[in-house]
Design a protein with these regions (language model features):
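Conserved "HGTGT" condensation-loop signature of ketosynthase/thiolase-family condensing enzymes
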Residues: 1-78, 95-99, 106-203, 207-208, ...
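A basic- and aromatic-enriched beta-loop-alpha substructure that forms the phosphate/nucleotide-
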Residues: 82
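A short, glycine-/small-residue-rich helix N-cap motif at loop->alpha-helix starts
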Residues: 85-86
Length: 389
């Protein structure tokens, strides 16, 4: 069902890897917020509400949004926080605009690496009776997912390696100074069957987007990436209740998003896509769950470059999480990257004449949470007479 109030993305700022500076987290959040507002041509006074994604365990402090609210403009302004994943802040921000109660929303997420061990943080968040005792972290769950796929398709290892190599090449083009040296060989060797270059070490990153309603944009002349469809779904947290070689939550989220956007032939209707790729096996699962290629066609599509930079549907031109992995906000970055593509602001990895883009975000153990977003380009309209620029 189309939204009653049409929401769109008008500003984006992405910091996929922050290194070598002495900024505090509060300063980093202030900077990414101001960059997104500048990209949208707005000031904080134009923002009706803010949604942030903040994880206390990753930040290493209780109620981390309290310390961050001033940096993102939340003092004396409506602000919400979600602890689950960065992409869920986008869902909340979109629905707040779509409900008609807000004209604009600022969505912000960040992922620090100051915790002594992110793997230990993830283990502490796991089920205390079974998963925590394994011990299990997200990378371990991702490896179990890869193993389940290999059991179903023994020849998959070569395809996965090709996907990883594609994304690393894309990352070197999109972010040449940031993507170098992010591979995590020690971590991958500890979690069979993942191989060198298939995963990246966690990095510090941040991302912000500005959302606005159609009525708000009628007062301004600005390009917009309309949110034409959005879906999200969740699988059980207990891995024993799931078939890790399948992705039913992704399929459910896809049906919802495509139904809202009127997408029937995704390979013909999308110009570019960004999908979850904490491992290349996840990207392969995304091809199937998003209706881009059945698993029987994976080998052919990977070999012929269908999803490469010059292919029919380029996937992860940014390099994805395989190149740069700010763990907690990588899902929101997938959405932000597609918004940039649709707005024509992706820089070195911009694809020509993008009008419709597909974003898929996944988080949790072995893609437990899935979010799918369809974005379409809207042309700038002349500002209403007498409107404030």
């Amino acid at each position: 069902m189309p939204y009653v109030v049409k929401p769109g993305v008008i500003g984006v700022a992405i910091m996929p890897r922050v290194t070598g500076d002495r900024r505090s987290l509060e300063e980093l959040l202030y900077d990414v917020t101001q960059q997104a507002l500048l990209d949208a041509g707005l000031t904080i006074e134009d923002i009706d509400g803010i949604v942030v994604a903040a994880n206390d365990q990753y930040d290493g402090r209780a109620i981390s949004v309290m310390a961050a609210s001033g940096s993102v403009g939340g003092v004396d302004r409506d602000i919400l926080s979600t602890p689950s994943a960065g992409e869920h802040a986008f869902v909340m921000g979109t629905l707040r605009v779509a409900c008609g109660q807000y004209r604009t929303q600022l969505v912000v997420a960040w992922s620090p690496t100051e915790a002594g061990s992110l793997a230990e943080v993830q283990r502490l968040a796991a089920d205390p009776y079974f998963h925590r005792r394994l011990p299990l972290d997200e990378l371990g769950a991702h490896a179990m997912q890869a193993n389940a796929l290999l059991a179903a398709m023994p020849d998959l290892q070569g395809m996965a390696q090709q996907v990883a190599e594609k994304n690393r090449r894309n990352g070197a083009t999109a972010y040449p100074d940031m993507a170098a040296g992010t591979a995590a060989p020690a971590a991958s060797k500890a979690r069979w069957p993942l191989q060198d270059g298939m995963v990246s070490a966690p990095v510090t990153g941040a991302v912000a987007l500005v959302l606005a309603s159609e009525a708000f944009l009628q007062e301004r002349s600005a390009p917009v990436a309309w949110i034409s469809g959005m879906g999200w779904a969740t699988e059980p947290s207990f891995l024993g209740d799931r078939d890790l070689a399948q992705a039913p939550a992704l399929e459910a989220a896809t049906r919802q998003a495509y139904g809202e956007a009127g997408i029937t032939t995704p390979m013909d209707e999308f110009d570019v896509a960004e999908v979850a790729d904490a491992t290349p096996y996840q990207e392969l699962l995304a091809y199937e769950g998003l209706g881009l290629a059945s698993r029987g066609a994976w080998a052919e599509r990977v070999a012929d470059g269908t999803f490469g930079p010059g292919g029919q549907l380029p996937v992860n031109l940014s390099g994805g999480a395989i190149s740069l992995n700010p763990v907690y906000c990588t899902g929101l970055i997938r959405i932000a990257e597609i918004a940039r593509q649709v707005l024509g602001r992706a820089g070195p990895h911009q694809r020509a004449q993008v009008r419709t883009g597909l974003a898929h975000a996944a988080s949790g153990d072995a893609m437990q949470y899935n979010t799918v977003v369809v974005l379409r380009r809207g042309e700038p309209k002349p500002a209403a007479q007498g409107a404030v620029p």
